């Protein structure tokens, strides 16, 4: 096509070259617009995450029971979606919470939540020790159902932490949600830090939790 242009008039050549120029500029413009839109969407999701995580979530236990939910900022970020689907009796979550603090929080809240399913996450904010994980599971062993979520945090301690969590989940008969495996290959679940969840990740996380909750028949039979 370009080789044939030399046999056309100067006016035709100019017009055709200008047309090619417009196509190139339009393509560049569309690419730039898409990039800007992607950045804007990322900024919007990041702002939503920041708003959700500004305040810790600590609620008073409800008289009618419900789920006992505790953990760090990932739990904090999924609380509204979980609350929209299930009855939460108590939630106690905070940004940056580590295992030592989690153990103390569990001890303080335990008296009010006897008979409730407990949902907790572990391993995002520090390298766990065997003593810490053992103490946490020992403290909650009498709950009728324990649901523990492991970590997908992009840190060097992730696999080591998850091995400890799996060991004690098996020992105490807990339901283990392998968030590391579930989220593998799904960057769209995470915000820019690779830890906190955007809406798609929140839904997947809560889906995994609700799949492990006791059914009505199990509750009736005391399982």
Segments from the language model and where they lie:
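Catalytic His-Asp segment of secreted/periplasmic serine-dependent ester chemistry enzymes
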Residues: 158-223
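N-terminal secretory targeting modules
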Residues: 1-68, 80, 111-114, 210-223
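Catalytic phosphate/metal-binding cores of nucleic-acid and nucleotide-processing enzymes, i.e., regions
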Residues: 2, 55-60, 103-106, 111-120, ...
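A short helix->loop->beta-strand "cap" motif at the edges of active sites that frequently abuts
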Residues: 142-145, 174
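Conserved SGNH/GDSL esterase-like catalytic core that processes O-acyl groups on lipids
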Residues: 60-135, 153-163
């Amino acid at each position: 096509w370009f080789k044939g242009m030399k046999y056309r008039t100067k006016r035709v050549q100019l017009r055709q070259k200008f047309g090619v120029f417009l196509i190139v500029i339009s393509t560049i413009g569309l690419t730039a617009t898409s990039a800007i839109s992607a950045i804007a969407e990322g900024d919007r999701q990041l702002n939503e995450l920041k708003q959700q995580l500004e305040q810790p979530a600590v609620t008073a236990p409800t008289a009618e029971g419900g789920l006992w939910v505790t953990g760090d900022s990932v739990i904090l970020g999924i609380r509204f979606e979980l609350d929209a689907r299930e009855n939460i009796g108590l939630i106690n979550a905070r940004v940056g919470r580590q295992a030592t603090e989690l153990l103390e929080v569990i001890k303080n809240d335990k008296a009010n939540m006897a008979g409730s399913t407990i949902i907790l996450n572990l391993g995002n904010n520090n390298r766990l020790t065997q003593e810490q994980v053992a103490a946490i599971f020992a403290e909650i062993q009498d709950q009728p159902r324990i649901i523990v979520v492991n970590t997908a945090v992009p840190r060097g301690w992730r696999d080591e932490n998850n091995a400890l969590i799996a060991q004690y989940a098996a020992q105490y008969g807990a339901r283990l949600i392998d968030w590391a495996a579930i989220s593998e290959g799904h960057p769209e679940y995470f915000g820019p830090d690779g830890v906190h969840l955007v809406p798609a990740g929140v839904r997947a996380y809560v889906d995994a939790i609700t799949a492990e909750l006791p059914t009505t028949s199990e509750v009736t039979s005391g399982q």
